[in-house]
Structure formats: C-alpha cells, structure tokens
Amino acid sequence: MFDILVYLFENYYTPQACPAADVLAKRLAAAGFEHEDIDDALGWLYGLAETTERCVELAHAPATGIRIYTDAEYQQLGTESIGFITFLESAGVLPAPLREIVIDRALASPETPISLSKIKIIALMVLWSQEAEIDNLVLEELLDDEGSRRLH
C-alpha cells in the first residue's frame, strides 16, 4: 500500500490531478500493483479525505497546547514516530490539524508500531493532499529511506 502512495506522489503533482478511483485502480494495476494493495491504498486515501473533513474545525483552534498521546496511540506509533511528528510540528511543517490527520492515518495502518519510514510517507501524503508547500530539505527528509525520487 505504501508503495502505491509514494507512486501517486511521484506521478501526480496534486491530488486533483488523480483520476477517479476506478480509473486510478486500472492505472495502478497496469503499473504492476496488486489488486489487494490497490484496494488498501484507495481505502486509505478515502479515509484521508474523511479525516481531513473532520479536522477542518481544528484549523480554527489555537495551536498553543501540547499533544498528549493516549496509550493506544503510543503503542501504535512508537517513540521514534512520535518524535518525528513532534519534529515536523516544531519545525513549522505540520500544523496541529495536519498532525491529527497524520496520527489518524497512522492508526489506520495495520503495522504496530508503525515504522519511521511509513510515518514519513504518511506525513508526505497528508501534506500532498493539502497541497502544502514542502521545503526541499523537508521533502528530502520525508523521502530519505527510498533513495532518489523525482521532485515536483
């Protein structure tokens, strides 16, 4: 599933450039992805859209508080991923509403604890879905595990 998410980032400049889900599924299958992974990725993206709609209200809340993770979140995310999310937030890359979306999408992953490389992909996809400007150094960090990628 995560390979498909990175593929979408690399091949579509914005989420609006992606075709409808059925057409996208056919293109992904033609690119060699497994149908089960395609279904997982499309479901994950649907969840991303739903979470984004719910987090719109958070955009107006003051972002002066400290995020306290529940035990379940801590177990699913792990120390390394929580540290990375905190790093992105303190660097000004990930505002509180987007942080909550990253956490929600990470909790939707079956991996426990989720690896740092997958958290990076999730953060990248959340920023991509919001068409956020991503500094080149941050982009390099988010894509660090996989070697060279095509930059937008």
Curated annotation (Swiss-Prot):
Coiled-coil ranges from the UniProt annotation: none
Pfam families: DUF494
InterPro entries listed in its UniProt record: Smg
Family (UniProt): Belongs to the Smg family.
Protein name per its UniProtKB record: Protein Smg homolog
Naturally occurring in which organism (per UniProt): Bordetella pertussis (strain Tohama I / ATCC BAA-589 / NCTC 13251)
Upper classification of the organism: Bacteria, Pseudomonadati, Pseudomonadota, Betaproteobacteria, Burkholderiales
